[in-house]
Curated annotation (Swiss-Prot):
Keywords, sorted A to Z: Bacterial flagellum biogenesis, Cytoplasm, Repressor, RNA-binding, Translation regulation
GO function term, MF aspect, one: mRNA 5'-UTR binding
Subunit structure: Homodimer; the beta-strands of each monomer intercalate to form a hydrophobic core, while the alpha-helices form wings that extend away from the core.
Gene from which the chain derives: csrA
Any single GO BP term: regulation of bacterial-type flagellum assembly
PANTHER family: CARBON STORAGE REGULATOR (PTHR34984:SF1)
Coiled coil, from the record: none
Pfam family membership, one: CsrA
Main location: cytoplasm
GO cellular component: cytosol
Subcellular location: Cytoplasm
Name of the protein this chain belongs to: Translational regulator CsrA
Function of the protein: A translational regulator that binds mRNA to regulate translation initiation and/or mRNA stability. Usually binds in the 5'-UTR at or near the Shine-Dalgarno sequence preventing ribosome-binding, thus repressing translation. Its main target seems to be the major flagellin gene, while its function is anatagonized by FliW.
Gene3D superfamilies on file: Translational regulator CsrA
Length: 79
């Protein structure tokens, strides 16, 4: 892990198109401003972890019984 020290108003550049700027330091809290292209996802750590957990649950296999019930329901709705 690269560790860099920055003061309020100073920035870190990543490649040509990402900038992380220290906006303020207040007690034990640091406010960061992040400029990045829309194609780059930027999340707080806890939000990213929650997204990953949701993705794991969504990717779980569906049982044959649940799948058959869904098909039966869809068939009834279309008639």
């Amino acid at each position: 892990m690269l560790v860099l020290s920055r003061k309020a108003g100073e920035a870190i550049r990543i490649m040509d198109d990402i900038e992380i700027k220290v906006l303020a330091v207040e007690g034990d809290q640091v406010k960061l401003g992040i400029s990045a292209p829309k194609s780059v996802d930027v999340h707080r750590g806890e939000v990213y972890e929650a997204i990953q957990e949701e993705n794991k649950h969504a990717a779980k296999p569906v049982s044959a019984e649940i799948l058959q019930a869904f098909i039966n329901h869809a068939n009834k709705a279309s008639t």
